[in-house]
A protein has these predicted regions:
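Glycine/Thr-rich beta-alpha phosphate-binding loop at enzyme active sites
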Residues: 44-60, 194-207, 241, 245-302
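Glycine-rich beta-to-alpha transition loops that act as phosphate-gripper elements at the mouths
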Residues: 82-85, 232-238, 305-316
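Catalytic cores of alpha/beta
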Residues: 89-94, 236-248, 312-329
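A gly/proline- and charged-residue-enriched helix-loop-helix capping module
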Residues: 105, 110-155
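C-terminal helical cap(s) of enzyme catalytic domains, especially alpha/beta-barrels
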Residues: 112-127, 267-278, 336-359
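Alpha-helix-loop-beta-strand connector modules within alpha/beta enzyme cores
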Residues: 128, 138-153, 205-225, 277-304, ...
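Active-site glycine- and acidic-residue-rich loops that bind
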Residues: 162-174, 201, 230-249
Length: 371
């Protein structure tokens, strides 16, 4: 591995680029024989070694994907979802494989281990994951110091949540919000993980109103302008959507992420791990999350950006969410199954789709399937 890292520039010249991409297909079975969390740790270490030059992931004609999000220009609307770089260790290295933006976290006020292991399960036959991690991270103070010492090179979101043992979840959100006000580009209020008991109660109107009103209070007192997003569960009832949208607009939330992992939707799964408890991500929730994008877009009428996440692993699946109303998309499970070249492939395919449909910029496609 160290020898490969030293010689990486030679390996990535000319036709050897194809050899390296092929190499990942050989490495994948070895990685998938590892425990999922050990494989994740290996991926983080690989990014720290910075052995993949950014030139490998450049795409011709990417200008058609240029957009802006929360006041910042980005090269493309493909983002890495929260959950991969939980404690802000490698976000700048992740940008180098082509992501337009990265979201770190979920970060809690205090460091915590999370739930007992094993807690991550691959569903290879379903191209999915089930996790019950429980917000394992290094804590807000450590994460803030890392970001301050390593200025983000592109749009960085910070996903926040409460500690498992807290006696006041709202206060935990407020603590994290105040800590991260001065850094990053946006803060995501994560009320949708199925792995922290009581967290999804914030989808109830009274609980959500109380939380958002207090977030607004500290935002108004702060000297820092910061965009706030809300990350929503895919296990909502349709009857809850209008109430949530009204509160989002009332309290001037700047964006919404649709959706987190699902506690349901197991009927079509065939993998042996499909019975595990936890949040389901990947292909099995692709249509579900896209439908939520469509429903929220209609309710919001384009007033704030939607970030679509859930089953994005190709240019086609990215375009489906954008056409349904997403201004940008995120992925995570697709990266696990397809490797670091997935971002380049999505961008190449997305460029071709846009051109074939007569769009001159990605923004023209947002909500196009509804117009």
């Amino acid at each position: 591995y160290k020898l490969f890292w030293r010689q990486r520039d030679n390996w990535f010249n000319g036709k050897k680029v194809e050899n390296i991409i092929l190499m990942f297909s050989f490495i994948r079975p070895f990685i998938f024989n590892l425990d999922p969390e050990k494989a994740h740790d290996l991926a983080i270490k690989s990014f720290k070694y910075n052995f993949l030059p950014s030139s490998l992931f450049s795409v011709q004609g990417e200008e058609i994907l240029n957009t802006s999000l929360f006041g910042k220009e980005i090269s493309n609307p493909i983002g890495l979802a929260a959950g991969f770089d939980k404690s802000a260790e490698v976000y700048n290295e992740i940008f180098k494989i082509g992501f337009g933006f990265v979201e770190i976290g979920t970060v809690t006020p205090k460091q915590q281990f999370g739930n007992e292991k094993p807690r991550v399960f691959r569903l290879e036959k379903d191209q999915a994951l089930i996790n019950r991690l429980g917000f394992n991270n290094d804590g807000s103070d450590v994460v803030r110091k890392r970001i301050e010492a390593n200025i983000p090179s592109n749009l960085l979101g910070i996903n926040i949540g409460p500690n498992k043992d807290t006696d006041n979840m709202t206060n935990d959100f407020l603590k994290c919000a105040e800590i991260f006000f001065p850094i990053g580009d946006y803060i995501t209020i994560n009320i949708s993980s199925p792995n922290t008991k009581g967290l999804r109660d914030f989808h109830n109107e009274d609980d959500l109103k109380n939380l958002l009103s207090k977030i607004n209070e500290i935002r108004e007192k702060s000297n820092f302008k910061k965009s706030f997003l809300l990350k929503i569960s895919p296990d909502l009832e349709d009857s809850q959507i209008s109430g949530i949208v009204n509160l989002i607009l009332e309290y001037k939330i700047d964006g919404i992420i649709l959706t987190n992992t699902s506690n349901k939707n197991r009927e079509s799964l065939i993998d042996v791990n499909s019975k595990e408890i936890g949040g389901l991500s990947g292909k099995p929730i692709k249509e579900l999350s896209t439908e939520f994008v469509r429903k929220f877009y209609k309710e919001l009428n384009g007033k704030i950006p939607i970030i679509g996440v859930g089953g994005v692993d190709s240019g086609e699946s990215a375009f489906e969410k954008i056409a349904a109303g997403a201004s940008a998309v995120q992925l995570y499970t697709g990266l696990i199954y397809k490797g670091p070249n997935i971002v380049k492939e999505i961008k190449k395919d997305l460029i071709q789709i846009l051109k074939s449909k007569g769009f001159t910029n990605i923004n023209e496609a947002v909500g196009s399937s509804l117009n």
